[in-house]
């Protein structure tokens, strides 16, 4: 799985959120290997706590820059880790992230 720009996305997320990041997970068609040229790159960002306006703006700006740079749509969904853990076996979306997702980065 070679997704141009994915490492840059992960590095950018870590630079913005630092110790708040619990896990970064690739999910969707790229994780399943069913992607096409029209597929977006779906990434779940599991954080300890919520976004503030400043970090949300930085994330949005970085993602837009990567979308333009690589002519690919990176779609980043931010999820509070406590909420994710509570509902991971119930909510279909969270189950999908757990079952099909590929962990790109995980806190030690």
Model-derived regions: residue spans:
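Short beta-strand->loop micro-motif that forms the acidic, two-metal-ion catalytic signature
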Residues: 42-46
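Conserved H-loop
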Residues: 29
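Catalytic core of pol beta-like nucleotidyltransferases
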Residues: 1-22, 32-37, 48-108
């Amino acid at each position: 799985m070679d997704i141009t720009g994915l490492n840059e996305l992960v590095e950018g997320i870590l630079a913005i959120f630092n110790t708040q990041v619990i896990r970064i997970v690739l999910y969707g068609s790229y994780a399943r290997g069913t992607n096409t040229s029209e597929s977006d790159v779906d990434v779940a960002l599991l954080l300890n706590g919520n976004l503030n306006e400043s970090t949300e703006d930085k994330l949005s700006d970085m993602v837009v820059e990567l979308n333009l740079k690589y002519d690919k749509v990176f779609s980043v969904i931010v999820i509070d880790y406590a909420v994710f853990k509570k509902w991971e076996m119930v909510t279909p979306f969270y189950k999908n992230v757990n079952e099909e997702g590929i962990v790109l980065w995980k806190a030690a």
